[in-house]
Amino acid sequence: MDLPVIQPGRPAKATGQPPIFQKIGIVGLGLIGGSVALAARELWPTSLVIAVDNKDVLETAMRLHAIDVAADDPVVLAEVDLVILAAPVRQNIELLAELDEHVRQPAVVTDTGSTKRAVVEAARALPPKFTFIGGHPLGGSAKGGLENARSDLFKGRPWLLTPSGASGNALEKLTAFVSALGAQPRIIDAAAHDRVLAFLSHLPQLTASALMQVVGDAVGQDGLALAGRGLADTTRLASSPAEIWRDITATNADEIGVALDELIAMLQDLRRDLPVGDRLADVFNGAASWRRALSV
């Protein structure tokens, strides 16, 4: 392991908020992890933000003054109060076992993954050396990476927490931390999370990617030059990175399968109805009503 790199000191500024956690460790400085780091540095200048990632990402983070300590090995997290696992889902699960060697109570460990059952089950299988509380901030973007991170990414957005029997004090502190970032913490069961997010997030992503692939293959580059805003708006998510979504689909395949089956059934229904259009009005009117109910 390379020695940790320490960021030069920064002047403290009064924020009116005492630190909830004195030492914050973040593993994975993508859009979510980077945004948490930036927000924490703004909110609690006297807290120490420690990050674990690859060398290039850490160098960028140091240039952006997003972190205080950069390292490539989780051993630096031995004394932290809060660990945030912000890597892809299956990598977070592997990291839990590594943390078990270094992190000790009363440390709180959370993650930011888009599925919850697998990581919660993995945490349950470990000895109780730290308190794990699953987490999922619903404040992402189609453009990922540290370069797109910003300190206000979570403002006004839900941040789902799956405590799974965690102690009240740990949950209280993590809830306060999430609230301070501007998010709206909400408690949800891990199974319910995966079922709901299959429809709210995973199905829209797969639909957007499949639609863009079908359209692109059918009309080619010349045809796409004629496209209007409708196609661009509908397929915005098609720019999302496949490496992240491979983990999401693998750890929520059953619930995503249910969601896909329901969409396929609806499309098949519309396909059969094309010559007469009897179902078209019902579907369009129902969809318009639900669209108005969206709070985003």
Task: Give the residues covered by each predicted segment.
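Residues at the starts of beta-strands that form the adenosine-phosphate
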Residues: 23, 48, 131, 158, ...
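Rossmann-like NAD(P)-binding element
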Residues: 74-108
